[in-house]
Design a protein with these regions (language model features):
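Mature, function-bearing regions of proteins
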Residues: 1-210
Length: 210
């Protein structure tokens, strides 16, 4: 079985202009997992575990509802509940940070859902906060190779980010490159610009300990 899951070596940029200007850039990696490949991927990689401790671990309880149902089932149920027609064998691709040595740090995850013809159907941006709360935002409007959504935030993220702002999501469909932007607006004024961009690498044991 040829696996399509991959790792992205990413550059994260965050630039806030209000209430006080602050900017940082740092490098991270993100896993891009076809959820149908999760079990064979863990068999292929010595340092990745599914619902068990390892150097890197993927726990279903960390995604969407805090229960141990399969993440794919939770994704499909969520989009159906929100008006998207989906069949059980649709593909779900998840871009996320795994647990590292059991520690959870995952500010945002991105889900991309594909139909039987591998055409993108919708995306979900799941935003987390410092209290380990999570809120999903469903993106169904596609502009070219991107899903777009501007929506009232209605979610506490940090002391520097008020509840009455808008999120503006722009999620490019993952391929050889990852290109994701999340901005915040106060009316017409953009007060936060953030992006995650990176290049795809193969999943190997060597890459996981590099």
């Amino acid at each position: 079985m040829e696996l399509t899951s991959r790792i992205y070596e990413c550059r994260v940029m965050h630039h806030r202009t209000s209430p006080k200007e602050h900017r940082f850039v740092h490098r991270i990696f993100m896993f891009c997992i076809d959820l149908d490949e999760l079990n064979p991927l863990c068999k292929h990689l010595s340092f990745l575990g599914h619902n068990r401790f390892n150097l890197y671990s993927f726990y279903d309880i960390d995604h969407l509802q805090k229960n141990d149902r399969s993440t794919k089932d939770k994704v499909l149920d969520y989009i159906r509940e929100n008006g998207v027609k989906a069949e059980d064998h649709f593909k779900v691709q998840l871009v996320t940070l795994p647990r590292i040595m059991g520690y959870v740090f995952n500010p945002v995850s991105f889900y991309f859902v594909y139909n039987n013809e591998r055409q993108p159907v919708c995306a979900i941006a799941e935003v987390g906060n410092t209290y380990h709360e999570m809120k999903p935002y469903l993106l169904t409007v596609q502009q070219g190779e991107r899903f777009r959504l501007r929506v009232p935030k209605h979610f506490y993220v940090s002391p520097f980010s008020r509840l009455d702002l808008d999120f503006d999501f722009s999620l490019a469909i993952p391929g050889d490159q990852l290109n994701i932007h999340i901005n915040e607006y106060e009316g017409k004024n953009r007060i936060l610009t953030s992006s995650v961009t990176g290049s795809a690498q193969s999943f190997t044991n060597r890459k996981l300990i590099w």
